[in-house]
């Protein structure tokens, strides 16, 4: 437990803890039937039709990140977060990593909102794809050999997982692509530890405008 919740990676540890608590609560309160649609909805899964009817439930764009559909879904995503989260949190720093994780997940769920409008979606993979793409983008902008090597490894994993998203039924391709798009923009927006000049101020501003504009457009289209 001490190794998992490492003080050197407080945000990764926090997200692991919150997601585990949500999953445990789902398990306890449903007697094991935690993968039912009504249970997922009650705990905050992404569901476009209810947001259109009740716009105040837009919080589902974030809450869905912490909800998982069954043991396999939960375990795979938590193992991924454990390893990816530590690496990315070390590169960006804890505060920026927190925003990267949450905003990538939000963008992924906005893609679900527009491109899979009737889907009930949940899981941390929208955020995880954002982590993948952020490091892949940095790989082509940095001279840091560690980030270059990590980015190349992430690119291979990213391609394998995207192919899996296409071939395996029940996986939200829209959410994965959306998370990756969000992470790519955020990699430009947020300065990396020790490499603040990787992107110019004007490049960061353009990326910020594009990110906010795309999010607003998707929300508008989804509500329409």
Regions found by a protein language model. Give the residues of each.
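Alpha-helical transmembrane segments that form the membrane-embedded catalytic/substrate-binding core
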Residues: 74-81, 122-134, 172-190
């Amino acid at each position: 437990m001490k190794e998992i919740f490492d003080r050197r990676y407080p945000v990764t540890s926090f997200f692991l803890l919150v997601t585990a608590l949500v999953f445990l609560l789902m398990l306890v309160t449903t007697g094991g039937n935690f993968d039912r649609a009504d249970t997922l909805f009650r705990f905050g899964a992404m569901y476009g039709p209810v947001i259109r009817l009740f716009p105040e439930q837009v919080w589902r764009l974030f809450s869905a990140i912490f909800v998982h559909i069954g043991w396999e879904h939960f375990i795979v995503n938590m193992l991924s977060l454990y390893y990816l989260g530590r690496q990315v949190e070390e590169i960006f720093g804890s505060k920026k990593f927190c925003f990267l994780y949450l905003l990538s997940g939000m963008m992924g769920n906005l893609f679900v909102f527009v491109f899979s409008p009737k889907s009930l979606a949940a899981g941390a993979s929208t955020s995880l794809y954002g982590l993948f793409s952020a490091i892949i983008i940095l790989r082509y902008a940095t001279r840091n050999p560690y980030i270059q090597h990590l980015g190349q490894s992430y690119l291979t994993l990213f391609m394998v997982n995207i192919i899996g998203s296409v071939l395996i039924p029940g996986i939200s391709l829209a959410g994965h692509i959306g998370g990756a798009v969000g992470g790519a923009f955020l990699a430009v927006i947020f300065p990396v530890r020790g490499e603040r000049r990787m992107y110019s101020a004007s490049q960061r501003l353009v990326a910020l405008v594009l990110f906010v504009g795309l999010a607003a457009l998707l929300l508008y289209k989804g509500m329409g």
